[in-house]
Regions:
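Conserved hydrolase catalytic core segment
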Residues: 194-206, 215-216
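Short, well-ordered alpha-helices that flank and scaffold nucleotide-derived cofactor binding pockets
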Residues: 39-46, 197-201, 324, 328
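Serine-hydrolase catalytic machinery in alpha/beta-hydrolase-like enzymes
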Residues: 5-12, 22-179
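Fungal eukaryote-biased detector of long internal structured cores
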Residues: 1-2, 12, 17, 172-177, ...
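The feature captures the conserved acid-bearing segment of alpha/beta-hydrolase catalytic domains
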Residues: 12-18, 207, 213-364
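Short, hydrophobic alpha-helical segments
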Residues: 167, 171, 358-367
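Residue in the alpha/beta-hydrolase core beta-strand immediately N-terminal to the catalytic nucleophile
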Residues: 179-181, 207-209
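Gly/Ala-rich beta-loop-alpha elbow adjacent to hydrolase catalytic centers
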Residues: 183-188, 192
Length: 367
């Protein structure tokens, strides 16, 4: 049960340009708050003078902020960023440091704060979290081979419905839901992914941003895409080629491992995809209060998932599994990026990638 029965007022930063064209909603992780997460993220300097991100196994990763399930404690580490050719480099023509807010001058940034709840994993200690859950060492939403029996469901429902109210208000202010970006770190990423999958407004979201997160209920939704005999359903794109050990590697590195990679996916299997999403909606008992027909399959929504290879709280395997599965549910094209030397945190390079992604999906010119 929540200790607080309401969501605190979000922390809002108006556009640096004074002109509101887009809104970016970003959720903190468990134990954090908007007051700690928002300013730290917006005050982090992005790489400069033609530099861009690198995902090399042995590459340094610049200034980092640890802001996940850590009560908002931050740590910094300085190193020179690496250079990557390709689309990611287009943002960085400036010669002095800029921030995410300056890179997206027409964006209004909204940082919600989760209510205080009792956390099962912390012996029911009171902490801010978007939903309750078991320790992430367990997989497939199971504990001791048992389904989690809805432990995370109640608060996750409240969070998703709250996010829908925020999205609707920001869409009203900016004039179009497609100008709203939703995302977060850790638990905030989870809530954003679920909310984006179940959103049934007349217009789709502009995009989804995830850091250090994962998609819950994958095994249950995959069961809706694959027949009971384990073979490919006739109306789904998920089949033997995507089964474990089939020899297909959706994360196979290209000749330039530093740069973006769009993952395969699709929503050709409309019946099964709809079944998977309706299972998730039914599990969370979220009513279709938004306008739009449940008989019409959602359109694609672009997304980016960023994850540190040294994350000791959310294993990168959970993120890569999520990145493999999400395009089949309509989050595509999806960019999945790994960062050597980065833990359960965001870094300047992660924020650089996010800035480029948002510029791409919103059609904003680089500065």
């Amino acid at each position: 049960m929540p200790v607080e029965d309401h969501f605190p007022e979000p922390l809002v930063f108006n556009p640096a340009s004074g002109i509101h064209k887009h809104t970016v909603i970003l959720l903190h992780g468990r134990g954090g708050s908007a007051d700690a997460f928002g300013p730290a993220l917006l005050n982090t300097a992005l790489p400069v003078a033609g530099t861009a991100i690198s995902t090399q196994q042995d590459g340094p990763h610049g200034r980092r902020r640890t802001l996940g399930e850590d009560n908002g404690v931050s740590t910094d580490a300085s190193a020179a960023p690496s250079v990557c050719d390709g689309a990611s480099a287009k943002l960085y023509n400036h010669i002095s440091p800029i921030t995410l807010a300056q890179a997206l001058p027409h964006a209004r940034f909204v940082f919600p704060t989760a209510p205080k709840q009792r956390a099962t994993v912390y012996k029911r200690s009171i902490i801010r979290q978007w939903f309750d859950d078991w320790h992430l060492g367990f997989v497939d939403d199971k504990v001791d081979s048992r389904y989690d029996l809805g432990l995370q469901t109640t608060e996750l429902v409240s969070t998703v419905e709250y996010l829908y109210r925020l999205i609707a208000e920001e869409a009203r202010l900016v004039g179009d839901t497609r100008k709203v970006i939703l995302g977060g770190i850790s638990q905030g990423c989870v809530a954003s992914l679920v909310a984006s999958l179940l959103w049934k407004g007349e217009e789709e979201l502009g995009g989804v941003v995830g850091m250090c997160g994962w998609l819950p209920y994958i095994s249950q939704m995959r069961a809706q895409l694959v027949g009971r005999d384990g073979q490919e359903s006739r109306d789904t794109t998920w089949g033997e080629d995507l089964e474990e050990g089939a020899g297909f590697d959706p994360f196979e590195r290209s000749a330039s491992p530093d740069c973006d990679m769009d993952l395969p996916g699709g929503i050709d299997g409309k019946g099964s995809v709809k079944s998977a999403l309706e299972w998730l909606r039914g599990e969370l008992d979220i009513l279709e209060t938004q306008s739009g027909s449940s008989d019409v399959l959602r359109s694609s929504v672009p997304a980016i998932l960023c994850h540190g290879q040294d994350d000791d709280k959310v294993d990168i395997a959970k993120a890569s599994e999520s990145a493999e599965f999400l395009p089949a549910l309509g989050l595509e094209p999806l960019r999945f990026k790994e960062y050597a030397g980065v833990g359960h945190e965001f870094s300047s390079e992660i924020l650089s990638d996010i800035a480029v992604f948002i510029q791409d999906v919103l059609g904003e010119p680089s500065i």
